[in-house]
Amino acid sequence: MKIAILAGDGIGPEIVAQAVRVLETLRSDGLKLELEQGLLGGCAVDAAGEPFPAATRTLVAQADAVILGAVGGPRYDGLPRQLRPEQGLLGIRKALNLFANLRPAVLYPELADASTLKPEVVSGLDILIVRELTGDIYFGEPRGIELRNGQRIGYNTMIYSEAEIRRIARVAFQAARKRSRRLCSVDKMNVLESTQLWRDVVTETAGEYPDVELSHMLVDNAAMQLVRNPRQFDVVVTGNMFGDILSDEASMLTGSIGMLPSASLDERNKGLYEPIHGSAPDIAGKDVANPLATVLSVAMMLRYTFDREEEASRIERAVKKVLADGYRTADIYEPGKMKIGTAAMGDAVLASL
């Protein structure tokens, strides 16, 4: 298993360091891992003059999976667009042909009070949103702003091909098989032809997965149901724009984005794994960042790229034990618990492994 480690910017090096410690512990227990560091984002601009240098491009192409910390920071905002750190992230997604974004939203019992919803509504929350990343209205052509009949008009094209829908549906069905075998497909087929095709193709694809229960929901209802009764969902699959919105909504049900990992996969389940939070330059170097989302990204990598369910579950159990034992970083701290720093949280996870 060859893994590229891209710490990135801001708190990235601190949180990724704890994830690497977890990987090294698994390696010492017999898991065959090869780890290699690379540069992406602002640190790559500083060292190589571009956010996604050739050496990193080669590294990630040869790796089986990539662990990323975070990229960006205000000191790069004045750079030309092509040199901004975020272009490195877009570049790696394109270079690796990543089309499926997996975003879990899990509420740990110990953090139930951190949610903005009542504990009885969100207790037991464990959702996986599978979002298509490369199509839809974000990338459809034609698009633009132009002058017509004396006034400006803006237009975009919402478009999906049958092949694009089928491949993301298969990712979602396979993910559902690893969980409770329930999949909800979200669309707006009552007014949008592109999502009528979405529903048709997902329904056809369900025939390949008779062991998975498929349901459909309109996106406006799904947004409402995520707040009204989020526990009804297990795996949700949807298009790029709807997934962009719903995954952010679901993440806030958990109370802390510092706890949430993500995966972006290609057709062979090679993946880029990263926390959903940003680089938080204001707390960089202060040993206060929460590394648990990055640690949980390692668990996702083991599950979805390497099919190592035992090791993935082992990491997740360790995180649950750390929380049950009362350890908290500043972002999830509450009175009566033990506030600890980034490295100490890494120590606690290793002790629980």
Curated annotation (Swiss-Prot):
InterPro entries: IsoCit/isopropylmalate_DH_CS, IsoPropMal-DH-like_dom, Isopropylmalate_DH
KW NAD (keyword) present: yes
Location in the cell: Cytoplasm
Reactions the enzyme catalyzes: (2R,3S)-3-isopropylmalate + NAD(+) = 4-methyl-2-oxopentanoate + CO2 + NADH
Name under which the protein is recorded: 3-isopropylmalate dehydrogenase
CC terms in the record's Gene Ontology section: cytosol
Residues at which Mg(2+) binds: 220, 244, 248
One GO term (biological process): L-leucine biosynthetic process
EC number: 1.1.1.85
Family: Belongs to the isocitrate and isopropylmalate dehydrogenases family. LeuB type 1 subfamily.
Pfam families: Iso_dh
Site (Important for catalysis): 138, 188
Biological function: Catalyzes the oxidation of 3-carboxy-2-hydroxy-4-methylpentanoate (3-isopropylmalate) to 3-carboxy-4-methyl-2-oxopentanoate. The product decarboxylates to 4-methyl-2 oxopentanoate.
GO molecular function: 3-isopropylmalate dehydrogenase activity; magnesium ion binding; NAD binding
UniProt keyword list: Amino-acid biosynthesis, Branched-chain amino acid biosynthesis, Cytoplasm, Leucine biosynthesis, Magnesium, Manganese, Metal-binding, NAD, Oxidoreductase
Location (main, coarse): cytoplasm
Residues annotated as binding substrate: 93, 103, 131, 220
Cofactor note: Binds 1 Mg(2+) or Mn(2+) ion per subunit.
Cofactor(s) the protein requires to work: Mg(2+); Mn(2+)
Residue numbers binding NAD(+): 73-86, 278-290
Pathway membership: Amino-acid biosynthesis; L-leucine biosynthesis; L-leucine from 3-methyl-2-oxobutanoate: step 3/4
